[in-house]
C-alpha cells in the first residue's frame, strides 16, 4: 500500500506500507508487515510485530509488540516496544522504552532509554539517561 495523503489506515497482516511526503494526520495500525516512511510525518504507528523504517521523517509515536524500528536522519521522540529491536542513525529518539530487546544508536541523540533486560549499544551518540532493570 502506498500512502500519499493524511488519513487512518488499517493494514492487513503482512502488507507493506510506504508513506511519501504526507502531512500530519497519518495513523497506521498493523499486525505484522512493514512500514517505510520518506520525508513524511507519520505521527501514530501501532504494530504487533513487523518492521518500521523512517528516513528524514517525523514519527513521534511508535508502539510495537516485538518487531524492528529503524530511523535514519529522523525524529522519533517516543518509541515503546515489548521485545524487538531499535536502531537509530543520525536521528533523534529522545524516549525509548523497552521490555527486553536491543537498542543500537550511531551518531544519534537518545537522551532517555528505559529497559527491563535487553541490550544497549551506542556509538558517537548522546544518551544521557540509560536505565536498565
Regions found by a protein language model. Name each.
Residues 1-133:
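Extended beta-solenoid/beta-helix repeat architectures
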